[in-house]
Amino acid sequence: MPGGMAPLKKPRNPTKLPLALNPTKSKDVLAVLAERNQAIIPVGAWVEPASPNWSGIPAHTSAYVVEEEIKEQQRRKQESLRHFQRQVRHRVNQRVKLRKKQQLHKSYKAAEKEGSIAMQYSDLAHLSSKRTSVFPSNLNAAVGRFRLPTSQVLGDAIEDGENQLFQQQAQALSQTMKQARHQLASFKTVSEKKTPVLPNGGRKGCPTQEGLGCGKISFVAVSEERDALFVSCQQDFLSEDKEKAFSKVQKVKFKNPLSVVIKEDERKQLHPHSLQAVLPEAQDYFVEVQSGLPESQSDVIDVQNVEPKASRIEPKTLGVEPDTQATGVECQTTEPEGQAVKTGIQDVPKVQTVELDGNTELEAQDFLPSHQAFLSRDTDCLPNCQYQDSLPKGHCVLPNYWNVLPKYQNQHFLPVDQEFLPRNQLALPKEQNHPLQCQKQDLLPREQFPLLLRHQDQREPHVLPKCQEHDVLSKAQNYLHNYQEQDLQLQNQEVNSKEPLSDITDGKGREIFSLDMFSKKPSTFMRRERGDEELPLDSPQCAPPQIQDQVFLREQSQQPSVRTAERWQEDLYLSGHECLPPRQRRDTCSRQQQVYEEYRSGLSTEQQALLAFQSGVDQEEDKKERQKQYLRHRRLFMDIEREQVKEQNRQRERKRRIEKIKKKKEQQRYAEEQRLLRMNCHEEPYSEEKISDVLAQLQLEEIKGAREKQQQREKEYIRYVEALRAQVQEKMKLYNITLPPLCCCGPDFWDAHPDTCANNCIFYKNYRAYNRALHSVINSSDISEGNATLRNAIRNFASAHRRTPKQSLH
């Protein structure tokens, strides 16, 4: 250019710094940008710590400020955490203190309640036993003191004051309890020989008829109150601090509690023969022990003008020993004057035969006036105060030990010149003064007829047993009624002295039923659960007096049927009069016979029903057994069928495989057969053209076969050469032998190969040239003698390439 002026260069733009690193920007802009961005922890790679007073690059200053802020935040967090922990600890301590105060308050309330209970029952004589601990050994355990941990010491002064106040109150309560126990100890235990004094001031004895119920109830109530108070005192008073101070306190204890007496009574009931050692003079007196209400109106017997002499009863019962005082309470069962004594059949046979101790038995003849007869429920003996003028002079009187007759028997006392008395004649001996025990038992069950005794020929000749008459006796002849006529007329007595015992007939001339009729059970025995029990057949009348008093006869409690209630009442009414007209007696006998026939029909019906029921049960059991057997057989056959199905499946599969094999063999056989047929068949002579075609075809097939074999051989040889090539290459690398490259297709000697070289290379598809080059290189190379293995491998490799079959192909 003219003038030699150089071209003007554009000045470079100054480097733009970031906004955060530009010191020319105001601090307000930096603050706004800092508020937008989140706080970033500085990285030590490019941020260096700077001194507080150093004013340099703003980036260093901002990093320092951020670090300080982070430290301040961590400090505030730790401070808030410590403050929260202190608050939690404070609240926990307050909760513990509040719970302790509540526990102390509850203990104080419990102590006040114990004090009020102790003051309320301090006047009772049976508070607790001698060894019962009223106070535990530790007062703190009684008041439930809460033991605080040693670390909690806040507010100990207030708590100590409260504990001291509570201890003073507990001490005052202990003093009150001490006074109450001393008052209890002031009572004395009553002597064993006297009647115990109850808390209400009464005496436990045999009261009169009017006061019997309340006395028994009060005794039971006192026993229950004593047991309940004893348990409550044992549970409430837990302190044992004053146990030694009150160890001398005595308990007012009854000689024999009610439970012991009841157990003794039950033992005596279950073992009636344990009273054999009772004195003979005490065995003649019996007590009425059953006071059951009647179960039907037909069993009610009126006893007129029964005057209970309670004043005569009480002195006899005051001397009863404590072991049988509870039994003595139940022995008075008579009603006041003017009331009718109702007797019934008890439902519980166990209570019907209670035998009491000889010390508690009373003279039952004191209950009745001199002109009344009291009928017992279990005996047929006459009372002790009936007129004795009904006995003729010619009657034989039994000795003293035969005065008490057994239960359920019609005792007929015969004169000297007579063997039997009539059925309606019931005579009373002079010395029969003592009724049997259980005088409230007056009626047998209506369905129950007396059975014949086995040893009737061993009895005394003057005593007629209860079943001596073989006819069916009426109900009135089995029981002694209280309205018996005292002046018996001897002209109405019918004497059957010439007839033997087995041929007795009734008033109408009918023959007596045989023994087999009475040996069967009544129908009602089969209706009851205990239907297999009969009355004992052994008669106690021939036994000595001690054994007679100990006979334990059980009374069946069957109710009579409703349809014969009126008939039984009428029979019972007629049986009360000894002197009946013959017509009424015949009516009674006919009705009696009708009732017996009804019982026999009922017996047969019940037996048939029982047999039908038993047969039904057997049929049901047989049905269940057949059902079980059917189910067993069904399971067995089902298993057999399953096995058969499995076997059939196996057979079918085997058959299918056999068919498949047969089909294949058949096809092969058919092909062979067709071939043989074609060979054996006569064909037309071939023409020359056809023969030449066949030969050409055969040649082509041979060439094709040879070519396939050659290709297979070449493939195997190529694989062998490649393996040998890899082996030589590895060994040469192992011995650090480096060969020069054969061509320019690769930098290495092994890169030259006819299959991999380029199409402009001399070795491309030229196996012969490659083999010559390879042999020349191997032969010109100097391999040490020590590498004999490598040398042999290289020679084999070269010879293999020399024999490459592709040489002939190319």
Curated annotation (Swiss-Prot):
The keyword RNA-binding does not apply. GO terms for biological process: cilium assembly; positive regulation of centriole elongation. Keywords: Cilium biogenesis/degradation, Coiled coil, Cytoplasm, Cytoskeleton. Signal peptide: none annotated. One of its GO terms (cellular component) is centrosome. It is found in: Cytoplasm, Cytoskeleton, Microtubule organizing center, Centrosome; Cytoplasm, Cytoskeleton, Microtubule organizing center, Centrosome, Centriole; Cytoplasm, Cytoskeleton, Microtubule organizing center, Centrosome, Centriolar satellite. Residues 65-89, 160-189, 638-669 form a coiled coil. Its main location: cytoplasm. Transmembrane segments: none annotated. Interacts with POC5, POC1B, CETN2 and FAM161A. Plays an important role in primary cilium assembly, maintenance, and length regulation. Interacts with centriole inner scaffold proteins to promote proper centriole size and integrity and assembly of functional cilia. Required for the recruitment of both the inner scaffold protein POC1B and the distal SFI1/CETN2 complex to centrioles. This is Coiled-coil domain-containing protein 15.
